[in-house]
Curated annotation (Swiss-Prot):
Transmembrane residue ranges: 236-256
Keyword Transmembrane helix attached: yes
InterPro entries in UniProt: Herpesvirus_viron_egress-type
Family membership noted in the UniProt record: Belongs to the herpesviridae NEC2 protein family.
Name of the featured protein: Nuclear egress protein 2
Function statement: Plays an essential role in virion nuclear egress, the first step of virion release from infected cell. Within the host nucleus, NEC1 interacts with the newly formed capsid through the vertexes and directs it to the inner nuclear membrane by associating with NEC2. Induces the budding of the capsid at the inner nuclear membrane as well as its envelopment into the perinuclear space.
Compartment list: Host nucleus inner membrane
Membrane topology (Nuclear): 257-263
Membrane topology value: Single-pass membrane protein
Lineage: Viruses, Duplodnaviria, Heunggongvirae, Peploviricota, Herviviricetes
Keywords (A to Z) from UniProt: Host membrane, Host nucleus, Late protein, Membrane, Phosphoprotein, Transmembrane, Transmembrane helix
Length: 263
C-alpha cells in the first residue's frame, strides 16, 4: 500500500505541476488510496481536474509522463484520460487503465478533433493511440515523438457552449529539448542509485490478476498550421543525492514555467 500511495502522489504531482502552468492552483480531486484503483478497468480515477475557460492544457505531455512513471513500476496497462461534461462542469479524469462501461458512466463518446463541441453528457477519450492518430495528418512522421511535437487543449467553456480546441505545438529547438531531458534523466537516475531506501518497487498486481478484470519545451512553442487549423545531515553520498534531486525538480519547474510562452 505504501508503494501505491507513493505512485498516486507522483502521478498527482505531475498533473499539478505540468497540466496548466498558468494556473497557480488547480482544482484537483485526488482518489482515496486502495488496491482497487490499480485494477484493470477500475472505475476510480486517480484524480479529477475541473477545467476552466480560456486555458491551455498540456494533455499529451502529462499523459506521456504518466506512462513513463507507470512503466517504471512495471504496470501492465496504459493510462487513459477522459474529458467529460456532466452538465455542471467539464472535467479531466485521469485513470491508470481504461475504465469499463464508459458510455453508461459518461454518455455519448466524441472523437478528438480540431474543434469539439462537448455537449452535456458526452466525453472524449484520450489514449496513446488517440494522440498519434490526431497528430499524424498534421506533422511529419519523424515529428510524432513527444520531443518534437505534442497535443494541447484550449478550452472555451461558457454558460451557452462548451468547446475544446485540440492543437499540435512544436518545439523550435528539439535538440536543446532532448539535451535538457537527458540532463534531468541523469540527475534523477543518480539520485535513485544513491538512495536505495527510496527506490521504487513494482506494484503488487494480484488485484489486477483477480479481476482480469518528458516535456515542456525549453524554447518557445508554435502552433502547426493546417488547412483547417488557424488557431494556434546524512552521509556525503545522501547529501549529493538530495542536491541532485533538488536540481532536477528546479529544472522541471523552470521548464514548466516556460511551456506556455508563445513566439
Amino acid at each position: 500500500m505504501a508503494s501505491g500511495k507513493k505512485l498516486i502522489d507522483q502521478l498527482c504531482s505531475v498533473v499539478s505541476s505540468f497540466l496548466c502552468p498558468s494556473i497557480s492552483s488547480l482544482d484537483i480531486d485526488r482518489c482515496a488510496v486502495g488496491p482497487h484503483i490499480f485494477s484493470r478497468g477500475s472505475s476510480q480515477a486517480i484524480c479529477t481536474v475541473k477545467l476552466l475557460h480560456g486555458e491551455v492544457y498540456n494533455l499529451e505531455f502529462v499523459y506521456r509522463y504518466w506512462a513513463h512513471i507507470l512503466e517504471k513500476y512495471n504496470f501492465p496497462f496504459s493510462p487513459t484520460f477522459i474529458i467529460c461534461n456532466n452538465g455542471l462542469a467539464v472535467t479531466l479524469k485521469c485513470y491508470v487503465s481504461e475504465p469499463r462501461d464508459l458510455s453508461s458512466r459518461y454518455g455519448q463518446a466524441t472523437s478528438m478533433a480540431l474543434d469539439v463541441n462537448l455537449q452535456r453528457n458526452s466525453f472524449v477519450v484520450l489514449s496513446q493511440d488517440d494522440f498519434i492518430k490526431f497528430k499524424t495528418p498534421l506533422v511529419f512522421a519523424k515529428d510524432l515523438d513527444i520531443t518534437n511535437s505534442m497535443v494541447v487543449c484550449r478550452t472555451y467553456l461558457t454558460s451557452s457552449r462548451n468547446s475544446l480546441q485540440f492543437l499540435v505545438v512544436k518545439s523550435k529547438n528539439p535538440r536543446r529539448l532532448e539535451n535538457v531531458l537527458d540532463m534531468i534523466k541523469r540527475a534523477v537516475e543518480a539520485t535513485g542509485s544513491n538512495l536505495p531506501a527510496t527506490r521504487e518497487k513494482p506494484l503488487p498486481l494480484e488485484q489486477t490478476e483477480q479481476l482480469e478484470s518528458t516535456l515542456p519545451s525549453s524554447g518557445h512553442l508554435r502552433v502547426l498550421q493546417s488547412t483547417s487549423l488557424t488557431g494556434r545531515c546524512p552521509s556525503w553520498g545522501a547529501a549529493c543525492a538530495l542536491l541532485l534531486l533538488s536540481l532536477a525538480v528546479g529544472l522541471m519547474a523552470i521548464l514548466a514555467a516556460k511551456l506556455m510562452q508563445w513566439p
